């Protein structure tokens, strides 16, 4: 029956065309000829839709409907780290074969718009990881439909999709991601509808040369894949495209890394100030600690609240530890300075001089010599004894204290051994940390994790 109907359509169309050609002259087609062509294709479309049921898929009960797809990306981006999503603008193409739409006519391809698409069966394709999808309708629905004479259809539409992009931020901001775009049939299992890529994997998804709309990422490329997803209603074919992104580090070097490095260097300037400069060293320590706190808070604002530490978090934490250690170092030096002992073993408190004993002893507000003489009484009795008494009288002598070699006085510009050690140890350790940090993360291969789709 299908063959007879197709043959009658073919003969009828050619009869009309030959009848119009019999009276035409060579040159531009007349208005009557154009009107006749319009009538021919109108009749063809009417006959195609006569008895057509768009509720039934092609090959129902006979075969599996194969839908071939490919994607042309006109715009990719932006990518939101906070919401873990990206936006993509595509021309989404689907092709399948419907024997009910075979025709014979003067043209091998019927080029139609969206009005015809609503009257025939089309795949119920949806995006598994799409948060919001928009079909453009200005000024008319951006849809294209082409029907070839053997019943093969090409259905193209322009879509803007906002899709999920699971991100693993352990290496942030030296991280890389594979953002998936997953689509498939919503109602038909793989026993009814299967999806295939139209071309080889390298050409099935193409990004326009000027299609990147990314400020913080580089689009490295894309890969395609397909798989089967098991759900409670059956097994479904899922087509997946991964867009591989690598983050640009320049913004974060300027906004976070350089300020952190400069803050650590500034905190180490206090080691070169003398230990008696308490106000200056206190200002250095407190200011740098507060600066690091502000930098750590601002660096986290642009990221989602993840439960693990990122590479930037580790860098900020180590810088914070260096700054805080510099403040503790000054507190330690100041503590020993106040106690009067420097770490070089010299006393800061000067030694008090010893008192010289006075040979006179004060008694009852009068001074008396330590050796009492009774010369006047003896002189009255015997002049000889008086002479002996005078000679026996001990005259007091001044006792001089023992002299010790003077110790070198402590100057106000003295340097503690802790400061001397810190001037070398802190910059050396911070330089080693930076060398290990940047060598580790910059040479690490991107870990692109693509979770298995599910429904």
Swiss-Prot record:
Glycosylation positions in this chain: 37, 137
Membrane-protein topology: Multi-pass membrane protein
Stored Pfam families: Neur_chan_LBD, Neur_chan_memb
Post-translation changes: Glycosylated.
Keyword Disulfide bond: yes
Stored Gene3D superfamilies: Neurotransmitter-gated ion-channel ligand-binding domain, Neurotransmitter-gated ion-channel transmembrane domain
Subunit structure: Heteropentamer, formed by a combination of alpha (GABRA1-6), beta (GABRB1-3), gamma (GABRG1-3), delta (GABRD), epsilon (GABRE), rho (GABRR1-3), pi (GABRP) and theta (GABRQ) subunits, each subunit exhibiting distinct physiological and pharmacological properties. Interacts with UBQLN1. Interacts with TRAK1. Interacts with KIF21B. Identified in a complex of 720 kDa composed of LHFPL4, NLGN2, GABRA1, GABRB2, GABRG2 and GABRB3. Interacts with LHFPL4. Interacts with NLGN2.
Protein name as it appears in the record: Gamma-aminobutyric acid receptor subunit alpha-1
Organism: Mus musculus
Gene: Gabra1
